[in-house]
Amino acid sequence: MKPNYSVNTSPKRSDEPIWWGLFGAGGTWFAMLTPITVLVLGILVPLGVIDAEAMSYERVSAFATSIIGALFIIGTLALPMWHAMHRVHHGMHDLKFHTGVIGKVACYAFAGLITALAVIFIFMI
C-alpha cells in the first residue's frame, strides 16, 4: 500500500523563525527585566530608597560605556521594539489590514532602525 502523502523535496524556506526569535527575546526581556528597571529607576531612586549618588552622571556613564551596560541598554531599547513590531505586523493581519510585504518591511525596518540607533548612540557616549 502506497502512502497518500508526498514530500516536497524543495520546500520554500521561511524567514519567520528569525522574527519569532526576536519576538520571543523581546517579550521575555520586556516581561522580566523592564519591570525591575522601572522599579529601580522610576520608583526606588526618586523615593530615596536607593541613594541618588548611585545614579550620578559619572557612574551611569561608566556603566553605559562598559560592555555589560551597553548590551543592557541596547537590549532594553531594541528587543521590546522587535516584539512590538512583530505584534503590530501580525495584529494588522488579524484585523484584516493585509499590507503584504510592504507592511512586513515597514514594521521590521522600524525595529531595525531603533536597534541601529541604540547601537549608534551607545558608541557616541
From Swiss-Prot:
Gene Ontology molecular function: succinate dehydrogenase activity
InterPro entries: Fumarate_red_D, SQR/QFR_C/D
Topology relative to the membrane: Multi-pass membrane protein
Compartment annotation: Cell inner membrane
Domain of life: Bacteria
Ranges that cross the membrane: 30-50, 62-82, 105-125
Gene Ontology CC, one term: fumarate reductase complex
Cited Pfam families: Fumarate_red_D
UniProt keyword annotations, A-Z: Cell inner membrane, Cell membrane, Membrane, Transmembrane, Transmembrane helix
Major place of residence: membrane
HAMAP family attached to this UniProt entry: Fumarate_red_D (MF_00709)
Family: Belongs to the FrdD family.
Assembly information from the UniProt record: Part of an enzyme complex containing four subunits: a flavoprotein (FrdA), an iron-sulfur protein (FrdB), and two hydrophobic anchor proteins (FrdC and FrdD).
Job of this protein: Anchors the catalytic components of the fumarate reductase complex to the cell membrane, binds quinones.
Protein name: Fumarate reductase subunit D
Organism ancestry: Bacteria, Pseudomonadati, Pseudomonadota, Gammaproteobacteria, Vibrionales
This protein's encoding gene: frdD
